[in-house]
A protein has these predicted regions:
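Hydrophobic anchor at the start of a short beta-strand
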Residues: 49
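Acidic, polar ligand-binding/catalytic clefts
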Residues: 70-96
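Serine endopeptidase catalytic core focused on the charge-relay Asp
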Residues: 101
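Bacterial N-terminal signal peptides
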Residues: 4-13
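Residue-level signal for tight coil/turn positions that link beta-strands
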Residues: 96-98, 128
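Exported/periplasmic ABC-transporter solute-binding proteins
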Residues: 16-46, 57, 61-67, 75-76, ...
Length: 271
């Protein structure tokens, strides 16, 4: 079998010719920033995997355009919309962790004592604190937008700062601005040692559940091979074993727990 190589094509405009031995996937930036894909994909030997880190929204567009053959996404609403227009796509939940609200160590908005994420967003707005938004149709931005909506708030442009970039860039910008932000837990763990002016403030609200899914055309056998490797083969164990600072970064989707639709949630007792 051929040795697989992981190519992180962070600049999406990179031109590359597709061959029978390569597989182009587009993905949320979080599984790149967290180090997960770099850790596990070199073990996949069927094809040479080329990874385009684009954010969930852009990744789904790439799949529809044919510039990606498989997507790893964590944006259920965008996934539902994409599936509605592509009956030939297969959908399968892959793993989960949590979103976390991160902010200044001093926590001037008292997010750490908030009963939940929606109340935390209300407190951030009420105290006039800066919030750094991804602003890029990513899965993290989708969840952030949902929290603002449920809070009944249209955040002021004076206090809503848009990074338009990856989760890693957004966290660094939050540290520089002493601002709050929403992050996936794994990327935060990967960077927290570099960002002593920030701390994790809220993570235990069920609304912060963060699910990852695979989407790919049914007829694409290369994509199907990688999907099977990730969900049923050695890749599944590698995801479950991946740690950051001795902490388990992802939980694999529980066996026997329905995961064929974007609104699927983790079975009781599995979180």
């Amino acid at each position: 079998m051929r040795q697989a190589w992981l190519v992180l094509a962070l600049a999406i405009g990179v031109a590359c010719s597709r061959s029978a031995s390569s597989l182009d996937i587009a993905t949320t930036t979080s599984v790149v920033n967290s180090g997960l894909l770099e850790a596990i994909l070199p073990q996949f030997s069927d094809y040479r995997v080329r990874v385009h880190a684009a954010g969930s929204g852009r990744s789904l567009v790439m799949l529809a355009e044919g510039s990606a053959e498989l997507v790893i996404s964590h944006a259920p609403a965008a996934e539902q919309q994409a599936l509605a227009g592509h009956s030939d796509w297969r959908y399968q939940k892959l793993a989960f962790n949590r979103f976390v609200i991160v902010g200044p160590v001093s926590d001037p908005a008292a997010v750490a004592t908030s009963p939940g994420a929606v109340e935390a967003f209300k407190r951030i707005a009420a105290t006039g604190r800066d919030f750094v938004s991804r602003g890029d149709s990513s899965g993290t931005h989708e969840r952030e937008t949902m929290f603002w909506r449920l809070a009944g708030i249209s955040p002021s442009n004076d206090h809503l700062l848009t990074s338009g970039a990856s989760m890693a860039v957004t966290l660094r910008q939050s540290a520089n601005k002493q601002a709050y932000t929403l992050s996936d837990q794994a990327t935060w763990w990967q960077l927290e040692g570099e960002l002593p002016d920030l701390r994790q403030l809220l993570w235990d609200d069920p609304a912060l559940l963060n699910t990852y899914a695979l989407l790919y055309p049914v007829e694409n056998l290369k994509a199907a091979a990688l999907a099977k490797w990730l969900t049923e083969g050695p890749g599944r164990a590698l995801i479950g074993a991946y740690q950051i600072g001795g902490r388990k970064a992802y939980e694999v989707w529980p066996a026997g727990c329905p995961g064929s639709l974007p609104d699927a949630t983790v079975c009781a007792g599995s979180r």
